[in-house]
């Protein structure tokens, strides 16, 4: 398991070489692909240098590199991101652009670097019951979401969510409440007492992320393309009740 929700190059190397240095390696699954989530489940993103290092190791050792981009828009538009979608296309063998979490009605757009995987993918879709009769509707959504380059609707919606998440972080920090992790995306993780959670429960349903210490929990807040300034105002007014 990782220390901060992200896989490190050293962890990947350790797993890979432990397998091949084992004289009975044929009795375990052969390493074939590295799977990264970006952003990770806790809102953290990889740096361009980290992705480059992982990509180079993968391609030197015959491993595919796949990036789960369910929240990719929020990662690419965060203040801490130093790579572009073009960098992902260069460094990865495959990744997907998440639509469902960034305003699309349904669906994700899978991007392949090589012709070999692209040619076989439609067979996999069909064999696993994922081929839609009206699949073109997926494409129409992404055509509209991605139109306009850096000023496209996809990135605008992501920036909107990130800005409101930053407002959540600022509001909690002004009340002296610590954040569990320095997320710069649309997810924030304040550390709250039971009493503080009950106050929020008047208007919201806080998601319990995990126990922090005696009497305090890590709670996750997610903003999205649909979050409104009015919702933020309501949250900030509830925080005024915190002692």
Model segments located where?
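Catalytic PLP-binding core of fold-type I/II PLP enzymes
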Residues: 46-78
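Conserved C-terminal alpha-helix-loop-beta "cap" of PLP-dependent enzymes
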Residues: 166-167, 171-241
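Active-site-proximal loop/turn and secondary-structure-junction residues that shape catalytic pockets
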Residues: 40, 71-73, 101, 225-227
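Structural preference for beta-strand elements that scaffold enzyme active sites
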Residues: 33, 64-66, 94, 218-220
């Amino acid at each position: 398991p990782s220390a901060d929700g992200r896989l490190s190059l050293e962890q990947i190397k350790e797993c890979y070489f432990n397998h091949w240095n084992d004289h009975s390696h044929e009795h375990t699954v052969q390493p074939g692909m590295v799977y990264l989530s970006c952003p990770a489940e806790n809102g953290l993103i990889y740096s361009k240098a980290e992705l480059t290092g992982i990509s180079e190791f993968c391609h030197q050792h015959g491993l595919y590199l796949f990036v789960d981009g369910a929240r990719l828009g929020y990662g690419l538009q965060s203040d801490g991101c130093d790579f572009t979608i073009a960098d992902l296309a260069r460094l990865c063998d495959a990744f997907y652009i998440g639509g469902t979490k960034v305003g699309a009605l349904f669906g994700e757009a899978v991007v392949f670097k090589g012709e070999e995987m692209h040619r076989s993918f439609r067979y996999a879709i069909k064999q696993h019951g994922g081929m839609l009769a009206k699949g073109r509707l997926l494409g129409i959504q992404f055509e509209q979401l991605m139109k306009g380059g850096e000023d496209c609707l996809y990135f605008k919606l992501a920036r909107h969510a990130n800005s409101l998440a930053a407002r959540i972080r600022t509001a909690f920090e002004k009340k002296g409440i610590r954040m569990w992790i320095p997320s710069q995306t649309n997810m924030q993780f304040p550390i709250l007492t039971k009493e503080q959670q009950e106050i929020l429960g008047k208007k919201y349903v806080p998601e319990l992320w995990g126990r922090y210490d005696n009497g305090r929990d890590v709670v996750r807040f997610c903003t999205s393309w649909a979050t409104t300034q009015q919702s933020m105002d309501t949250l900030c007014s509830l925080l005024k009740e915190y002692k």
